[in-house]
Amino acid sequence: MKKGKIVLGLCGFCLLLSSCGSSQNATVGNNTDPNNHSVSTTSMSRETSDIQYLKKDLENGTVSIWYFETSTPQDTIAIPEEINGKTVSQIGERLFEGNEEVKTVILPKTVRAIGNSAFNFATTLEKVEISGPVEILENSSFYGCNSLQELNFPDGLKKIGDHAITACSSLTDLYLPGTVEEIDEDNFALCGEPLKIHVPAGSETEARLQEIMKSNGDLNIQIVEE
């Protein structure tokens, strides 16, 4: 059984999963723990396997996914837009950290933030489909994703945190919108040789990238104006 992340102290959750057996599209009620995390099984299936999620309720009424579990190995994970009627707005920290099976992750248009180390060392990850305006990439969110060849962020991205896109050795093309206001200078090292960063000409994003290149002459990046 493949786990999205190791979680300690979830004995009740394990018992719940074992009670589901091999039934398909099982529905699990809201079993909220004292820390305000709840167990949810979505009706979305890929082939014959359901994906179980643990979510964390956020103050704005949306949820963050901080754990997932599948009954069989799956190379594609499509994150749902909603869990139990609540909008999924965040990919929780370390959700896919160290994952060695998933090749494609499909994010819904509702996601606004990708948490700390969310895809850290997800070494088999080849593709992330981003359809909505993700605003924040937290620290080390894509660190060490050695199978990624391209990342494309739509308009709306504002912040790229510390080492968010670093040590992605196969990454050759990164597409950034002109909306990026903050890029930590500890990014883009140990990526493709060179890493081509596609940005709108004359944008704030391009100006920030130029500053980073001046302060770190060892970075092997190429700005491609579009």
Where are these regions (language model features)?
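C-terminal motif of bacterial Sec signal peptides marking the signal peptidase cleavage site
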Residues: 16-19
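Non-globular, low-complexity intrinsically disordered regions
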Residues: 64-66
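Bacterial signal peptide processing site
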Residues: 21-24
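Consensus positions within tandem repeat domains that build extended binding/scaffold surfaces
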Residues: 92-95, 115-118, 138-143, 161-166, ...
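Bacterial N-terminal signal peptides that target proteins for export
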Residues: 1-8
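N-terminal low-complexity, Pro/Thr/Ser-rich intrinsically disordered segments
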Residues: 29-58
